[in-house]
Curated annotation (Swiss-Prot):
One of its GO terms (cellular component) is cytoplasm. One of its GO terms (biological process) is translation. Pfam families: Ribosomal_L21p (PF00829). This protein binds to 23S rRNA in the presence of protein L20. Belongs to the bacterial ribosomal protein bL21 family. Residues 74-84, 126-135 have a biased composition (Basic residues). The lineage of its organism: Bacteria, Pseudomonadati, Pseudomonadota, Alphaproteobacteria, Hyphomicrobiales. HAMAP family: Ribosomal_bL21 (MF_01363). The keyword Ribonucleoprotein applies. This is Large ribosomal subunit protein bL21. The gene is rplU. Part of the 50S ribosomal subunit. Contacts protein L20. It comes from Brucella suis (strain ATCC 23445 / NCTC 10510).
Length: 142
């Protein structure tokens, strides 16, 4: 079974275990992402999306595409400009194509709240006193 999903302003025809490069999607390697904007599943066409359809995918890697050179030259004016751009891309592997509101077998990664707790724990620790070696060197120099 295949589906057509929309992400990053583009449409992609995907099937299970497909490996595709899409515009940057939030998440790190190994995270599970969900695409709820499914335009078509098999022979079912959405208007504009298919109700209850969901595509889950695993982030394989975050990377950047090839450099695109934008070169502008104004003839007979001794004027030119070169600019380069590399688009950020995410490589994903399609895990499942779900219909009729079915639940995914793997949960999508939730927001990382433990990091905030760790930051609070570090702030609660008292600062250590300055090392005594610096004071000893200052006394010996006098």
């Amino acid at each position: 079974m295949f589906a057509v999903i929309k992400t990053g302003g583009k449409q992609y025809r995907v099937a299970a275990n497909d490996l595709i490069k899409v515009e940057k999607v939030a998440g790190e390697a190994g995270d599970i992402v969900e695409f709820a904007e499914v335009l078509m599943v098999g022979s079912t066409i959405g208007a504009p999306t298919v109700a209850g359809a969901l595509v889950t995918a695993e982030v394989v890697e975050q990377g950047r595409g090839r450099k695109v050179i934008a070169f502008k030259k104004r003839r007979r004016q001794n004027s030119k400009r070169t600019r380069g751009h590399r688009q950020e891309l995410t490589t994903i592997r399609i895990s499942e194509i779900l219909t009729d509101g079915a639940k995914p077998s793997k949960k999508a990664a939730e927001k990382k709240a433990p990091k905030a707790d760790a930051a609070e724990g570090e702030a609660a620790k008292p600062k250590k006193a300055a090392p005594k070696k610096a004071a000893a060197k200052a006394e010996s120099a006098e």
